[in-house]
Regions:
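Mature extracytoplasmic enzyme cores
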Residues: 1-144
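Carbohydrate-binding surfaces of carbohydrate-active enzymes
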Residues: 78-90, 94-192, 197-311
Length: 311
């Protein structure tokens, strides 16, 4: 139980523990390590599970995020500054994940100064075992407190910095967080958004009105309304074909998804995707379908674009 947790201290490099009773005790040691998580690279051989997939960065570290902005956003601005605010209207951040993709199992997000951040939010260091083990009735509340502190750290280190950079350079921050129901993390988005993907929302099986993902469109529209933002967005249609056959995604499917989002207050869509080419297996299978020139119903797309434009 929570009340039995004790913090041990090293004396001359040695930690000693004398069992106080005949009960069963566990000794827990917490270690800060790399997650081993990756991101999806832009070249062949750099996707999930592939040998050259780039390692993910520490999104909770403001210095790491600052360096990221310097080598990416600043570079875009150096080359395209004359188009910022006109042709270039926003920067898109796409489901940033703290641990990265496919991290080591059993880890939770952390960074060098997170313990101080966690304690400053009103939590106790001695509560940390509850993040891994059941410590009684306080366990769920401790985990909620941890998640709240984690989200605020991510907001401060990552989203806030990028949002301020975008505002300073005359463009918006848009895109979406990692998970469907993370409405709180939309705080710093000038155009808050979500991602309709993998047919998690669909006309069949009540997927449009039940479950975690059914809140997506309302997350973005409510975030915009509460914060006085004019636009809110959804990336949509990626891997949304029926029965796992994503190239079977039809115009009827597209119409259903658009109506589902529009009726919930979404007023800006990012259709996924318009590919330069679908030649070859890796391109053909890269998060289909193509809703652009490589699709058989491209000649009718003006009907879709006009419908989107009216919203």
């Amino acid at each position: 139980v929570y009340e039995s947790i004790m913090k041990l201290y090293a004396e001359q490099g040695i930690i000693r523990f004398k069992v106080p009773d005949d009960g069963k005790w566990s000794l827990l040691v917490f270690t800060l390590c790399f997650s081993g998580g990756t991101i999806r690279g832009i070249h062949f051989g750099e996707d999930d599970g592939e040998p050259f997939a780039p390692l993910s960065a520490d999104l909770l570290n403001p210095d790491a995020v600052s360096a990221f902005i310097e080598i990416t956003h600043e570079r875009y601005y150096d080359v395209l500054k004359e188009y910022f605010g006109s042709t270039v209207i926003a920067m898109f951040t796409d489901e940033p994940c703290i641990l990265g993709r496919n991290p080591q199992k059993g880890l939770i997000p952390w960074t060098d100064d997170f313990l101080e951040w966690y304690i400053s939010a009103g939590n106790e260091e001695i509560s940390l075992p509850a993040l891994w083990t059941d410590c009684g009735e306080k366990t769920e509340q401790i985990r909620r407190n941890y998640r709240k502190a984690l989200d605020s750290k991510l907001e401060h280190a990552y989203y806030r910095q990028i949002s301020e950079w975008c505002e300073k350079h005359g463009i918006a921050l848009t895109g979406h967080p990692e998970k469907s129901d993370e409405i709180g993390l939309l705080k710093y988005f000038h155009i808050p958004g979500q991602d309709i993907v993998w047919r998690w929302v669909a006309p069949e099986d009540n997927k449009g009105i039940e479950g975690e993902h059914s809140t997506m469109a309302k997350c973005s529209s409510d975030s915009a309304r509460h914060r006085g933002r004019r636009r809110n967005s959804n990336e949509c249609f990626g891997c949304c074909g029926p029965h796992g056959i994503h190239w079977a995604f039809s115009m009827d499917d597209m119409k259903w998804y658009m109506d589902w989002m529009f009726v919930r207050g979404v007023n800006l869509l990012y259709p996924h995707a318009f590919f330069y080419s679908v030649e070859g297996e890796k391109r053909y299978g890269e998060r289909p379908p193509d809703v652009g020139p490589n699709n058989t119903w491209w000649k009718y797309y003006n009907l879709i674009s006009a419908y989107i434009k009216r919203m």
